[in-house]
Design a protein with these regions (language model features):
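Generic structural hydrophobic/aromatic packing signal, biased to beta-strands
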Residues: 24, 83, 167, 171-173
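Conserved small/polar residues in nucleotide/adenosyl-binding loops
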Residues: 191-192
Length: 193
Protein backbone atom coordinates (compact mmCIF):
# COMPACT_ATOMS: atom_id res chain seq x y z
CA UNK A 1 0.00 0.00 0.00
CA UNK A 2 1.40 3.39 -0.98
CA UNK A 3 1.30 6.39 1.33
CA UNK A 4 -1.21 9.10 0.43
CA UNK A 5 0.42 12.40 -0.59
CA UNK A 6 -1.25 15.36 1.09
CA UNK A 7 -0.87 19.11 1.38
CA UNK A 8 -2.64 21.51 3.70
CA UNK A 9 -2.98 25.12 4.72
CA UNK A 10 -5.19 28.00 5.75
CA UNK A 11 -6.76 29.93 2.90
CA UNK A 12 -8.85 33.06 2.65
CA UNK A 13 -11.90 32.22 0.53
CA UNK A 14 -14.14 34.70 -1.29
CA UNK A 15 -17.72 33.39 -1.02
CA UNK A 16 -20.57 34.96 -3.02
CA UNK A 17 -24.18 35.46 -1.88
CA UNK A 18 -25.18 32.06 -3.31
CA UNK A 19 -22.45 30.31 -1.30
CA UNK A 20 -20.15 29.71 -4.28
CA UNK A 21 -16.40 29.89 -3.74
CA UNK A 22 -15.02 32.51 -6.13
CA UNK A 23 -11.38 32.10 -5.10
CA UNK A 24 -9.10 31.03 -2.24
CA UNK A 25 -5.73 32.59 -1.48
CA UNK A 26 -3.20 30.44 0.41
CA UNK A 27 -0.28 32.55 1.67
CA UNK A 28 1.55 29.41 2.84
CA UNK A 29 1.14 25.68 2.21
CA UNK A 30 2.69 22.60 3.79
CA UNK A 31 3.31 19.20 2.21
CA UNK A 32 2.64 16.18 4.41
CA UNK A 33 0.09 15.03 6.94
CA UNK A 34 -2.17 17.76 8.28
CA UNK A 35 -2.10 18.47 12.01
CA UNK A 36 -5.01 17.44 14.21
CA UNK A 37 -7.68 20.10 14.60
CA UNK A 38 -6.44 20.95 18.11
CA UNK A 39 -2.86 21.38 16.83
CA UNK A 40 -3.55 23.56 13.79
CA UNK A 41 -1.70 26.85 13.60
CA UNK A 42 -3.77 30.06 13.62
CA UNK A 43 -4.71 31.49 10.25
CA UNK A 44 -3.64 35.08 11.07
CA UNK A 45 -6.09 36.66 8.60
CA UNK A 46 -7.44 38.96 11.33
CA UNK A 47 -9.75 41.73 10.18
CA UNK A 48 -9.45 40.93 6.47
CA UNK A 49 -11.64 37.87 7.13
CA UNK A 50 -15.30 38.86 7.54
CA UNK A 51 -18.62 37.04 7.62
CA UNK A 52 -20.49 40.15 6.45
CA UNK A 53 -20.81 40.58 2.70
CA UNK A 54 -18.97 43.58 1.28
CA UNK A 55 -20.26 45.79 -1.56
CA UNK A 56 -19.35 43.02 -4.03
CA UNK A 57 -21.68 40.67 -2.14
CA UNK A 58 -18.62 38.67 -1.07
CA UNK A 59 -17.68 37.29 2.34
CA UNK A 60 -13.98 36.59 3.06
CA UNK A 61 -13.82 33.41 5.12
CA UNK A 62 -10.83 31.46 6.50
CA UNK A 63 -10.81 27.84 5.29
CA UNK A 64 -8.52 25.05 6.43
CA UNK A 65 -7.97 22.76 3.46
CA UNK A 66 -6.40 19.31 3.32
CA UNK A 67 -5.81 18.00 -0.20
CA UNK A 68 -5.22 14.35 -1.06
CA UNK A 69 -3.02 15.04 -4.06
CA UNK A 70 -3.45 11.68 -5.81
CA UNK A 71 -7.25 11.74 -5.66
CA UNK A 72 -9.63 13.82 -7.82
CA UNK A 73 -10.29 17.39 -6.69
CA UNK A 74 -13.06 17.62 -4.08
CA UNK A 75 -14.11 21.28 -4.28
CA UNK A 76 -12.97 24.79 -5.24
CA UNK A 77 -10.78 25.18 -2.13
CA UNK A 78 -8.96 21.96 -3.03
CA UNK A 79 -8.56 23.14 -6.64
CA UNK A 80 -7.06 26.45 -5.53
CA UNK A 81 -4.71 24.66 -3.13
CA UNK A 82 -3.36 22.51 -5.98
CA UNK A 83 -2.96 25.53 -8.27
CA UNK A 84 -1.02 27.30 -5.50
CA UNK A 85 1.22 24.24 -5.03
CA UNK A 86 2.22 24.40 -8.69
CA UNK A 87 2.83 28.15 -8.75
CA UNK A 88 4.69 28.06 -5.40
CA UNK A 89 6.94 25.34 -6.89
CA UNK A 90 5.93 22.89 -4.16
CA UNK A 91 4.76 20.46 -6.85
CA UNK A 92 6.09 19.87 -10.33
CA UNK A 93 3.83 19.84 -13.39
CA UNK A 94 2.05 16.53 -14.04
CA UNK A 95 2.56 15.30 -10.45
CA UNK A 96 -0.87 16.29 -9.08
CA UNK A 97 -4.24 14.79 -9.90
CA UNK A 98 -6.16 17.68 -11.50
CA UNK A 99 -9.13 15.56 -12.59
CA UNK A 100 -12.31 17.59 -12.46
CA UNK A 101 -10.68 20.97 -11.92
CA UNK A 102 -12.82 22.80 -14.49
CA UNK A 103 -16.04 21.46 -12.97
CA UNK A 104 -15.00 22.56 -9.46
CA UNK A 105 -14.09 26.16 -10.38
CA UNK A 106 -16.66 28.88 -11.05
CA UNK A 107 -16.45 31.45 -13.81
CA UNK A 108 -15.50 34.67 -12.04
CA UNK A 109 -15.35 38.34 -13.02
CA UNK A 110 -11.76 39.29 -12.04
CA UNK A 111 -11.49 43.04 -11.35
CA UNK A 112 -9.31 45.67 -9.75
CA UNK A 113 -11.60 45.24 -6.69
CA UNK A 114 -11.16 41.48 -6.55
CA UNK A 115 -13.45 38.66 -7.68
CA UNK A 116 -17.16 39.17 -8.39
CA UNK A 117 -19.86 36.62 -9.15
CA UNK A 118 -20.86 36.70 -12.82
CA UNK A 119 -24.64 36.59 -12.35
CA UNK A 120 -25.10 39.89 -10.48
CA UNK A 121 -21.98 41.74 -11.61
CA UNK A 122 -23.69 44.86 -13.00
CA UNK A 123 -25.61 45.55 -9.78
CA UNK A 124 -22.62 44.76 -7.57
CA UNK A 125 -20.44 47.05 -9.68
CA UNK A 126 -22.85 49.90 -8.93
CA UNK A 127 -22.74 49.02 -5.22
CA UNK A 128 -18.92 49.11 -5.19
CA UNK A 129 -18.83 52.43 -7.04
CA UNK A 130 -21.33 53.96 -4.60
CA UNK A 131 -19.54 52.56 -1.54
CA UNK A 132 -16.18 53.84 -2.75
CA UNK A 133 -17.64 57.28 -3.42
CA UNK A 134 -19.31 57.38 0.04
CA UNK A 135 -16.12 56.33 1.82
CA UNK A 136 -14.32 59.41 0.52
CA UNK A 137 -11.50 57.20 -0.73
CA UNK A 138 -11.84 58.51 -4.28
CA UNK A 139 -9.74 61.51 -5.25
CA UNK A 140 -10.73 61.40 -8.91
CA UNK A 141 -14.13 62.62 -10.12
CA UNK A 142 -15.00 59.11 -11.32
CA UNK A 143 -14.40 55.66 -9.88
CA UNK A 144 -14.83 52.54 -11.92
CA UNK A 145 -14.56 48.80 -11.55
CA UNK A 146 -12.20 47.54 -14.24
CA UNK A 147 -12.80 44.02 -15.51
CA UNK A 148 -9.50 42.24 -16.08
CA UNK A 149 -10.99 38.95 -17.28
CA UNK A 150 -13.91 36.55 -16.95
CA UNK A 151 -12.47 33.10 -16.41
CA UNK A 152 -12.09 30.20 -14.00
CA UNK A 153 -8.38 30.91 -13.45
CA UNK A 154 -7.04 34.18 -12.00
CA UNK A 155 -3.74 35.87 -12.68
CA UNK A 156 -0.95 34.06 -10.85
CA UNK A 157 0.76 37.18 -9.48
CA UNK A 158 -2.37 38.19 -7.54
CA UNK A 159 -1.80 35.03 -5.46
CA UNK A 160 1.81 33.87 -5.87
CA UNK A 161 4.93 35.86 -6.81
CA UNK A 162 7.74 33.35 -7.46
CA UNK A 163 11.33 34.45 -6.97
CA UNK A 164 13.83 34.66 -9.80
CA UNK A 165 11.36 35.21 -12.66
CA UNK A 166 10.49 38.10 -14.95
CA UNK A 167 6.92 38.57 -16.17
CA UNK A 168 6.34 41.18 -18.88
CA UNK A 169 2.53 41.03 -18.71
CA UNK A 170 0.92 39.57 -15.58
CA UNK A 171 -2.39 39.07 -17.42
CA UNK A 172 -0.77 36.30 -19.43
CA UNK A 173 0.25 34.06 -16.52
CA UNK A 174 -2.53 32.18 -14.73
CA UNK A 175 -2.50 30.63 -11.26
CA UNK A 176 -1.24 27.07 -11.63
CA UNK A 177 1.64 28.03 -13.90
CA UNK A 178 4.93 26.55 -12.67
CA UNK A 179 7.68 29.04 -13.53
CA UNK A 180 11.18 27.80 -12.79
CA UNK A 181 13.74 30.25 -11.48
CA UNK A 182 15.29 32.14 -14.39
CA UNK A 183 12.09 32.06 -16.47
CA UNK A 184 11.19 35.17 -18.47
CA UNK A 185 7.63 35.51 -19.73
CA UNK A 186 7.58 38.13 -22.47
CA UNK A 187 4.49 40.29 -23.11
CA UNK A 188 3.55 38.18 -26.15
CA UNK A 189 3.74 34.89 -24.19
CA UNK A 190 1.00 33.06 -22.32
CA UNK A 191 1.49 30.60 -19.46
CA UNK A 192 -1.17 28.38 -17.91
CA UNK A 193 -1.48 24.92 -16.33
Amino acid sequence: MTEQRTAWGWGLASIDAAGNTLDVWYPELTLGEAPAETSRPNHNFGAIAHDEADARGVRRMPVFTVSKLDEPIEDAADAYLRLHLLSMRLAKPNTLNLDGIFAKLNNVVWTNYGPFAVDDFALRKLDVMAATRQSGAVLAPHVDVNVLSIDKFPRMVDYVVPTGVRIGDADRVRLGAHLSEGTTVMPVSYTHL
